Every structure is written in C-alpha cells, then in structure tokens.
C-alpha cells in the first residue's frame, strides 16, 4: 500500500465495512481503467456488498445528479473488469520479463533495456523513420514558371506535361524556358468549380494534444495536465481522456447552455451570439452519433462559464476546446476554385486560383487550425478560353526531393492512433481501428517514458531516437514485441472478453506461453551490448557535435561487417554503437574513427563508406551550428585522417 494513500484507503475500507452501509457506488472514471481501480480497492478492502455503477462524463452538479438517478448494476460491469485486469496484468508480465531478459542479455551494468507492448512499437516507428531519412538520396529537379500579362492583369503558371511538372535535367528546363520566352499564350482551359470544406470534428484527447502541439508547442503530457485541471478543478470541460469525437443524442437538449459558456470568452463572443441568434443549432451525424460514443463522448465545454482567471496553459486549452465546439455548428467553408491551362508554342502551363465565397467555420480560425496560416491559391483575374496572354516573364527554379520528416509529437500521436495501418492482417487491422497503440490517456506517458529511459530526445517539437533506442530496435529485429500486431491481437481478444465471448483464464494462459517464447528469443539472439546514452553536463542523451574522428571507436564492441579499409593501418572499419572505427584498435591502438553524429547530423553507413572510399562525401544537409541553425557541408578526411567539415567556398 502506498504510504501517501494508506490513510485514505483506511477511510474507504472502514466505510465499506460499516454495517450501516448496504451498497457501494463505484464512482471511478467511466471506462476500462476506472473499473480496474475500483476492483482492486474493492478486493483489497475485502468487501462483498452489492455494487452500483455511476457512469458520467462531466463533474458538474447537474451531471452528477443525473448520474445518480440512473445508476447501473455493478454485475453488468464484470466483463469490463475482466478485460481491464487482463490487459493490466498481461502488460506487467510481458514488460517485466522482456525488460529483464534483454537487460541481462544485452545491457551493460546499470543500463536497463526497457521493453513493453506499447512503448517498443512506438519507438520502432521513430527508428524506422530515422533509417528512411538516412537512406534517402536527394535528387535535384527543375521547374519552369511563366508569368502571363494582358492589359493590367497578370497570372502565373507552372509548366507541366502529362501530370508531371518536374524536369530531371537542367538543360531540358532551360530549353523550354527559352522556347516560350517572348511568346504568346493561348488559354485552352478555364474551368470554375465550387468546393466546400466541412468543419473539423470535435476533440478527443489525441486530437487535442496534436493541435496543442502544433499551435503552442505543448507536449502531450502538458496538454493532458491542463485538460485534467480544467475537468477536475475548474469543471469547465468534460472528461478529457476520451477516444470519441462525437456526442450522444441525449446531450442535444443541453448544447445551447454550452454554447453560451463557450461564447463567454471575449474572442469567441461574436460566434456564440451568432449561433444563439439563429435559434436551433444545426445537428448532424458529424456531431451526434450514438454508434460512435462508447465509454465517453467528445471533449466539449460544460455549461459553466470561465471566470477569465485561468493559468496560461489552461486558458489556451480551454480556448481550443471552446473554439472547436462552436466551429462544428458553423456552415461549411465554400470556395470557387479555378483551373487554367495556357499553351505557349506547344508547351502547357497550369494555373490555379481560389475565391472564398463563405468563410463558414474557418472564420473561427483566421490563422489556420494549426496556428499557421495555410497558403491559399491566389485570386486569378478574369480569364476566358481562347484569350491570348503575353509571356511577360519566364523563370527556371531548382529544387531537391526531400526525405520524410522526423516525427513531431503531434505526428507521433497521430501515428500511434492509426498504428493499425501497419498491420497486414485485415481482421487485426480492424481490431486496432478504434484503439491504436496505447489509449488517449496513456500515449503522453508512453512518450515521456521513452524519453526518461534514454530512447528518445526531444528537440523543440521534434522527437529523435538515441543510439540506445536504435540499438534496441536493431536487437529486437522482427520480434512480435516490436510490432503493433501484438496490440491488435490483444485488443481483438479483450473486446471479445468485454462482450463475454472470451475468458480471462484462456487469455492469461496464452500470455504465459508468449512470455516464455519471448524470453527464449532473447536468450538465442546475438548482438553487441548496448551502452547508456552519453552524458554531458550531468545529463543523459546529449548528442556529440564533434567532427574530429581521432578519438577512437573503443567505446563499444564492434559489429562484424566491414565498411572499408582503415586509411591509417589498412584494417577493416566496422560499426560500433557511436562510431565507424578501426577494428584493430585493441591490438594496434589505431584510433581512427568516424563518429556517427557530426554537428548534430547522423552519418549513415553509406556516407561512411563513401568517405572511406573517396576521402570525402558529397554536400550533405542537416548539420546544425551551436546556435541551432541548419547548414550544409561535405565530410572529408584531412592529412591526419581526421574527419572535418568542408564547405562549398573552401579551396
């Protein structure tokens, strides 16, 4: 028993055992985890009295009264309790055994290799993305732009041919530019088409966390804490740990009061007034759908108005919830999109334009939903088919293909939510459709856990795997513990358990078999021991910024594959945890090494091979100065075989 809660538990236990008490009301959170907390307390207290279940999503006085007027029979909740206990115990058994197995087999003294059903597949998402970025080979391309003029009007177009607007050769782009320069364009297509954009759905916790990260840079945990305070202490929003983005029909009658509360915020007052003046709120299945509400409905404001004296984080989160709640009742944003094709000397140019007919819900988001004003197509002048427009200007622009971006916290939350798409089996993919990796309530803690154990680093809004995290995923290989498929199979069976078609004993028996195989798998694997993240200024996880490769690669046991010959002594160069180094360092003391992180950029095996073979790489992007500014440079070996940066303007 936790010392901090022992006294409180004694009070609860005493009340449960009081002869005057004939029934116990379970008022824990309405959901799987709330059911679990109550079950543990009930069993620990040795209580056997009948249980009634309070099932509510708001802590306002009115909501609590309504909940007590419709208490559920606790016996109906037994399947939910079984599923909750099974999930909790299975996670504990798998995590404890897998962590110990891999820590003993591959960890160094004092360095635990934490492994878990949710955190490990999440880490693999980031490591796989990092590998994609490292293996990506940028390719240059060229695009031709033209400006067309007629009287006082102009518009711009981009060259295209068969849906392709990029040219792989500069000479070809310049030839097209020269061909159309000074020519006259004829409009062969001028099509106008009306389009609309529906308002975004109400918030569940994951979407709220993603939006707060994109707009304010909040971590998922920071958003959850603010939302929890708004729910528990301020009573301004409904239950935040929800996975639903819809409301139930029985809530429709009370929505106007919530509009009044949301509209009490000065910046939202005009929008609240507009909805109230219209009379009846427009209700659609994008707002109210009983089939898409399970334990809890979407996060919305309560009917309590804010006093206006909220802490900064809570103020921002409350604004997000209130703004989204009002936005769903506004009409679609409507546009008139224009597509124009202009032909010049057998070459075609595409132009797109847009006119906003009705901002609709977008009026609540003048700076965009994510806090960044989206670049809209320009308003084109009047253009008709058959018109001739002079080519006033032609330009050739060079571009380069870009690797997939690293995960921001917002993007990772989205990937965890939709992790089922990485599962090949259709039935299992469907089982994960409404769950993903973790739950809305636990995803923030999973990310923080990955950081605290040294698997991830947070660089502003970006999450980057450490060497330790990469090493673990490499060791695990195709183990089921690193795949979302394990969660898919669990969720499929736990859902059946909630409905009485799966037994808890069968599920836990299979978990035991799985754990035994997992431990045997760890014992049979071969690989190097994993070092803890490097320390700098007393902190773990700091990245090396050195370009000098003279420090040697003796920090780790080398892997067997040779990347090339050591330029100092001719021995094979192999990869270690932190460097590509001479394999003969122990015998001969050769200290040649190419560090895997140089000025904030990871050096891939392919780049190390190029450096060994040619003495330099091509220009590479992704380096960072001490001030955090990105720059490009090549890596080269100097006369003493040390790695240094070479810039374009160097001789």
PLM regions: where:
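Residues immediately within or flanking Cys/His clusters that coordinate Zn2+
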Residues: 563, 579, 587
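Toprim catalytic domain recognition across nucleic-acid enzymes
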Residues: 1-420, 425-437, 441-448, 452-455, ...
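Short, surface-exposed polybasic-aromatic patches that bind anionic ligands, especially phosphate groups
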Residues: 617-618, 622
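Short, cationic/aromatic linear interface patches
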Residues: 337-342, 347, 624-649
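Short metal-binding segments enriched for Cys and/or His
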Residues: 588-614, 645
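Short cysteine-rich clusters marking metal-coordination/redox-active sites
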Residues: 566-569, 582
